[in-house]
């Protein structure tokens, strides 16, 4: 920071000297005096510069100290902000924990209240059940005395529960026998109803079977007639097929004879197979066409001969 200020003062001194040189040039001052004046001006300027430098150093030190104080305050403020932020975060965390604990306590209190209500209801039900059992016990006291008397009369049983178990077994057996009896009676009634239905439906069934037998007999007779008709048609078809086969054989023999005659007329040996009837017919057809063309040519040549 000192170099720019020194440059500034040096430039200011040069400007000041440059402004005074013309004025001094006008005056006729001896060179020695001018040199002394210049030295004095330089000394004054240097003193002024040193004074300004001292002031500048003082201000710079003060500013530096001020900056350090400001930086220290800034660091302190940042630390305060950090501590305050941490304090706020801790406070918020404590508040959230307190809210969660309060909510959990309310929830637990609600659950405890519900559990207490359930237990109280269960207690009331148990009390009612106890009262009902007490009333039943009072009603069953005569039965208990009666069972004890019966146990004295029955030496085969040592305890009342044995007698009660035996009685329960007999009661269950009796109930099972009664159920089985009802089921058998129901089956018997169903069998009787089915037998009566069969007896009632027997005449109708016999009549229906007779009608069905007559229908089947009619269908059998019709089938026999159709069989005879088809047999006669089959014989007729066989006869017709035999006639067609005989006619086909004769036709094939005639075609073979014609083919052989044509080959003999042409002086050529037969080259086609005996079973190739179509080829033989085609050969005879070509021969007949050639012969017809030849005869037609002869018919046209005979009238032309007398004219010549």
UniProtKB/Swiss-Prot annotation:
GO CC annotation: axonemal doublet microtubule; motile cilium
Coiled-coil region: 34-143, 175-233
Principal location: cytoplasm
Keywords attached to this entry: Cell projection, Cilium, Coiled coil, Cytoplasm, Cytoskeleton
InterPro entries assigned: CFAP_domain-containing (IPR051147), DUF4200 (IPR025252)
Keyword Coiled coil: yes
MF term (GO), any: dynein complex binding
Physiological role: May play a role in ciliary/flagellar motility by regulating the assembly and the activity of axonemal inner dynein arm.
Membership in a protein family: Belongs to the CFAP73 family.
Record's protein name: Cilia- and flagella-associated protein 73
Organism of origin: Homo sapiens
Lineage, top ranks: Eukaryota, Metazoa, Chordata, Craniata, Vertebrata
């Amino acid at each position: 920071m000192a170099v720019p200020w020194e440059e500034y003062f040096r430039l200011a001194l040069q400007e000041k000297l440059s402004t005074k040189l013309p004025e001094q040039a006008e005056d006729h001052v001896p060179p020695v005096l001018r040199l002394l004046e210049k030295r004095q001006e330089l000394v004054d300027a240097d003193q002024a510069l040193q004074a300004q430098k001292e002031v500048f150093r003082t201000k710079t030190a003060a500013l530096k100290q001020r900056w350090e104080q400001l930086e220290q305050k800034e660091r302190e403020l940042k630390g305060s902000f950090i501590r305050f932020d941490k304090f706020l975060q801790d406070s918020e965390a404590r508040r959230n924990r307190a809210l969660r604990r309060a909510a959990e306590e309310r929830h637990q209190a609600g659950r405890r209240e519900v559990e207490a209500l359930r237990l109280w209801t269960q207690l009331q039900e148990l009390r009612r059940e106890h009262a009902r059992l007490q009333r039943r016990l009072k009603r069953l006291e005569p039965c208990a005395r009666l069972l004890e008397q019966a146990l004295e009369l029955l030496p085969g049983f040592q305890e009342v529960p044995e007698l009660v178990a035996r009685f329960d077994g007999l009661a269950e057996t009796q109930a099972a026998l009664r159920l089985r009896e009802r089921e058998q009676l129901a089956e018997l009634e169903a069998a009787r109803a089915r037998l009566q239905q069969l007896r009632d439906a027997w005449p109708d069934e016999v009549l229906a079977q007779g009608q069905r037998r007559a229908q089947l007999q009619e269908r059998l007779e019709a089938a026999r007639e159709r069989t005879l008709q088809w047999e006669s048609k089959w014989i007729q078809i066989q006869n017709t097929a035999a006639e067609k086969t005989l006619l086909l054989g004769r036709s094939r023999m005639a075609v073979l004879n014609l083919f052989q005659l044509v080959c003999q007329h042409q002086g050529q040996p037969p080259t086609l197979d005996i079973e190739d009837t179509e080829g033989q017919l085609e050969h005879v057809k070509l021969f007949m066409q050639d012969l017809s063309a030849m005869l037609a040519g002869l018919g046209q040549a005979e009238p032309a001969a007398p004219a010549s």
